[in-house]
Curated annotation (Swiss-Prot):
DNA ligase that catalyzes the formation of phosphodiester linkages between 5'-phosphoryl and 3'-hydroxyl groups in double-stranded DNA using NAD as a coenzyme and as the energy source for the reaction. It is essential for DNA replication and repair of damaged DNA. The gene is ligA. Residues 624-713 form the BRCT domain. The keyword GTP-binding does not apply. Its EC number is 6.5.1.2. It comes from Persephonella marina (strain DSM 14350 / EX-H1). This is DNA ligase. GO terms for biological process: DNA repair; DNA replication.
């Protein structure tokens, strides 16, 4: 559709137009000078996004262009043309699935990025309906893949993608395998005979991190973000594969509802948006019911939006803003819709988490397992309030697959606590001066030849005494997720290594404090605190020690599983691969990795040395302060304010109980924090005892292990 030369021109023109603000357009002549170029670049980016699914600018940059065009057309309506991008919604349809017409159009939302936009929206709504104070329902804006669900006579009959808003793709078989979509629901209790519900398919952030952790360990590139992972999963041709992806569906709008006589129920029997979401919640749908707040007036709306922007990273799902809807559905017809969006709703978008920038150079880093990772140094760019100046390029295959070169313009994404990621190279912006990336043949740290094991995508340094590996292993051992040694962070570890104080993990427990106190930046107090933290780490539960050993593929969850099934860490040297595979969370690859680690004499020697230095390698009575939770199984859901979920789980286990990640009839308690997930509903359905956070704190407050007391806020 576009030649390479034309694409290059449009990208260059995009950069120029992004510098233009609506205040710069003062006359009709100013508008006429840019409006066709503006439409051309928006059409081009629509094509890249919706047809190729391969955008070259961020959503924020696109919205800047789109809003500029809308502003010009609103001020000079005589310049509007029937084919303007503002007059239609682009399509993402392919021929892979049958097409189906929605019962009600699935329009986009108008976007706002500041308080002024929200106040202007409120002004228009108030003027249109003649009411001084409007009641709004405000809820999180999920960053997933849009779907519509149709139920007839209480039965699920169809699921579809958004498509062009009028026609979508029928993906019913794939939707049926998503466990949070009820296959039947008693809508008839509310007089509803046929209903269409709009929703979003998502992947929980923790699940997404697990998927990416596994992919990285296998040498595969991580998925860019939960949204792309969810959208890609929905379009798989095999529903059995879809079922494996851990997808969840949230519903957030009833777009069509009629009784058995065909009478419309929206705006009369279903009068308020908040109440309609409550109905869906009570019928077993996953919805933002507990997150929705009904706000009187725009000031309350703005406060709630800002509150969520501050806590967005604590929410279990990726959200990119808030949706503000007029709560009274009976006003919707009076407010109307445009060809693009309803006038009764608007999205408040959080700060952008994508941006384009240039690769300056590439360096190669060696990790604790010897994996050599290429890291691109970037022209610094702000993404979501954080300045990003480097990004991992994963491995050689990732570089080749995306054809990444030094000097390239790249689209970077940083979502929540997900590490920055190269979404794509803007090849259309290339000038011919870009240089291919040459992967080294020798370790950049120790000079040993690099090897690429069969079946892996990662080049490795196999010299276990490689300085870079040693330092990274020590950093990991002392980290928060492992032995949690405060004051022994990355900077101090690197300094101590350079000075010869640290050459192995056991060296942590024989640091020369008399020499450290003489270093710049260290005083009597800081050295005493460091010594105390190191001494305290000797009594960590053995699951933390197992984590700290840095066994490949073994994270916190697997380490806890191993610890539950042994008395001493050294016991694992007597386990066979088959024994290990019988444990939950341990498959063939992980079992072999554990087996190999404990059959390496150097590793056994290190564990024995740690034991001689006073590190607890066996379960001792001291590890369980009191067995008040003996025989009890706890499951945690939602965000706790008293402590992290990991600390809560550790307290339960130190008190003799078991912390599980799933709810069953054998579960003793489900502890519910803020924004609980599906585990809460499952507990209710199974009759499992529910504890709120206050009840849980009451149970543990007099029994918290000493070394965890400063991590719990009572």
């Amino acid at each position: 559709m576009y030649t390479k030369e034309r694409e290059r021109e449009l990208i260059q023109r995009t950069k120029e137009l992004l510098k233009i603000k609506k205040e710069h357009i003062k006359t009709k002549e100013d508008a006429e000078a840019i409006i066709e170029d503006l439409r051309d670049v928006i059409r081009y980016h629509d094509w890249r996004y919706y047809v190729l699914a391969n955008p070259v600018i961020s959503d924020y940059e696109y919205d800047q262009l789109f809003h500029l065009l809308k502003d010009i057309e609103s001020r000079f309506p005589e310049l509007i043309t029937p084919d303007s991008p503002t007059q239609r919604v682009p399509s993402e349809l392919t021929k892979e699935f049958p097409q189906v017409k929605h019962l009600a159009p699935m329009l986009s939302l108008d976007n706002s990025y500041n308080e002024e936009d929200l106040r202007e929206f409120d002004r228009r709504v108030r003027e249109a309906v003649g009411i001084d104070i409007i009641e709004y329902a405000v809820e999180p804006k999920f960053d997933g893949a849009g779907i519509s669900l149709v139920y007839e006579k209480d039965m699920f009959v169809r699921g579809a993608t958004r498509g062009d808003g009028v026609v979508g793709e029928d993906i019913t078989p794939n939707i049926r395998v998503i466990k949070t979509v009820p296959l039947s629901a008693e809508f008839s209790v509310y007089g509803i005979d046929r209903i269409e519900i709009r929703g979003e398919v998502l992947i929980n952030k923790e699940k997404f991190k697990e998927i990416n952790h596994q992919r990285l360990e296998e040498g595969l590139p991580p998925l860019a973000n939960p949204r792309n992972a969810a959208a890609g999963s929905l379009r798989l041709q095999d529903p059995k594969e879809v079922a494996k992806r851990g997808l969840e569906a949230f519903v957030y709008q009833i777009t069509y509802a009629v009784d058995k006589d065909g009478n419309n129920l929206l705006g009369n029997k279903l009068r308020y948006h908040y109440d309609s979401i409550k109905i869906l919640y009570e019928l077993g749908f996953k919805s933002p019911y507990k997150e929705i707040k009904v706000c009187r007036g725009i000031d309350e709306v703005i406060d709630y939006c800002r509150e969520w922007e501050r806590k967005r990273d604590d929410y279990p799902y990726e959200i990119d803003g808030m949706v503000i809807k007029v709560n009274d559905i009976s006003l919707y017809d009076r407010l109307g819709v445009t060809s693009h969006h309803p006038r009764w709703a608007i999205a408040f978008k959080f700060r952008a988490r994508q941006a384009t920038t240039k690769i300056i150079k590439v360096v190669f880093q060696v990790g604790r397992t010897g994996a050599v990772t290429p890291v691109a140094k970037l022209e610094p760019v702000e993404i979501g309030g954080v300045t990003v100046s480097s990004v991992s390029l994963i491995n050689e295959d990732f570089i080749k697959e995306k054809d990444i070169r030094v000097g390239d313009l790249v689209l970077i994404e940083r979502a929540g606590d997900v590490i920055p990621y190269v979404v794509k190279v803007v090849t259309e912006a290339r000038t011919g001066k870009e240089k291919p990336i040459q992967f080294p043949k020798e370790c950049p740290s120790c000079g040993s030849p690099l090897v690429k094991p069969a079946g892996e995508a990662v080049w490795r340094c196999i010299n276990i005494n490689c300085p870079a590996q040693v330092v990274e292993r020590i950093i990991y051992f002392a980290s928060k997720d492992a032995m949690d040694i405060r004051g022994l962070g990355e900077a101090n570890i690197r300094k101590f290594y350079q000075l010869g104080f640290l050459r192995s993990i056991p060296d942590i427990y024989r640091l020369p404090y008399d020499k450290i106190i003489q270093l710049e930046g260290f005083g009597q107090k800081s050295v005493e605190n460091l010594k105390k933290a190191i001494e305290e780490s000797k009594n960590r539960p053995i699951n933390r020690l197992i984590t700290g050993l840095g066994i490949r593929f073994v994270g916190k969850v697997t380490a806890r599983t191993l610890a539950e099934n042994i008395n001493c860490v050294e016991d694992l040297k007597d386990w066979s691969v088959e024994d290990l595979e019988r444990l939950p969370d341990v498959g063939y690859v992980v079992a072999h990795s554990i087996y190999d680690f404990f059959h390496n004499p150097d590793n056994i020697k290190m564990i024995q040395e740690l034991k001689r230095l006073g590190v607890q390698t066996c379960k001792e009575k001291e590890e369980v302060v009191e067995n008040i939770f003996e025989g009890k199984t706890f499951v945690f859901t939602g965000t706790l304010s008293c402590c992290s979920r990991e600390i809560a789980q550790e307290i339960v286990e130190r008190l003799g109980g078991h912390a599980s990640s799933s709810v069953s009839r054998k579960t003793s308690y489900v502890v519910v924090g803020e924004n609980p997930g599906s585990k809460y509903r499952k507990a209710l359905s199974l009759g499992v005892q529910i504890l709120d956070e206050k009840q849980f704190i009451e149970m543990i407050k007099d029994h918290i292990p000493d070394d965890l007391k400063d991590k719990v806020h009572l």
